[in-house]
């Protein structure tokens, strides 16, 4: 279990404290109360209600069809089950197109029980991040492979190799300067993700970004080895096979993140 007291709910300042103390953060996605309750009781520090629900719950080929109403419904379902994990919810595709639209969507998510909202990308999103933070809404940034940009990327590909790694470093610092309290790095080569994590004052959460991040996140279906109807990424590991039950799988995943055994080189990308 986490060294963060079991009875003490996670807060945004506690995340930064964990980074300063070198304690790895454990994050999983959840979309309903039943799984969220199990994750919360078995060592997960942060729950992400991701727009990945479009693929693993609704059966779409991407996250693009997910709406703010979808996100609010699933966020409220998860929030009712949590005692200690901090709840992060995605802003859906184009909900953050303007600061005003982002504020409306973020307000709905916080009213549904989220404690932080996640925004993909940098660039014009920096204005959105600043706008929300100035209005007391905590923000998690998401860089690297950002699924809402899948059409521009031409598929789900590793990001940040070569010269693109330097731009990723600049973007990471920029989102923190704009006020982000947490940063998800997805499908980023281990060396650049490790460097970014060392340079930033806020925690980084990796998904396919190697062991040098300050924590890890997986889509719950991937962590449990469930067939989501999509190709399994390299960084995915089936913890249900060794855990023997859903609760056991969650504990095995949490322990592996905390002791540094996951992800290993087999579940990460080289430079």
Curated annotation (Swiss-Prot):
GO CC aspect terms: cytoplasm
One GO molecular-function entry: 3-methyl-2-oxobutanoate hydroxymethyltransferase activity
The keyword Cytoplasm appears for this protein: yes
Cofactor, free-text remark: Binds 1 Mg(2+) ion per subunit.
Major localisation: cytoplasm
Presence of keyword Cytoplasm: yes
SUPFAM superfamilies tied to this protein: Phosphoenolpyruvate/pyruvate domain
UniProt: 3-methyl-2-oxobutanoate binding residues: 51-52, 90, 118
Active-site residue list: 186 (proton acceptor)
HAMAP family reported in the protein's UniProt record: PanB
Protein name: 3-methyl-2-oxobutanoate hydroxymethyltransferase
Protein species of origin: Xanthomonas axonopodis pv. citri (strain 306)
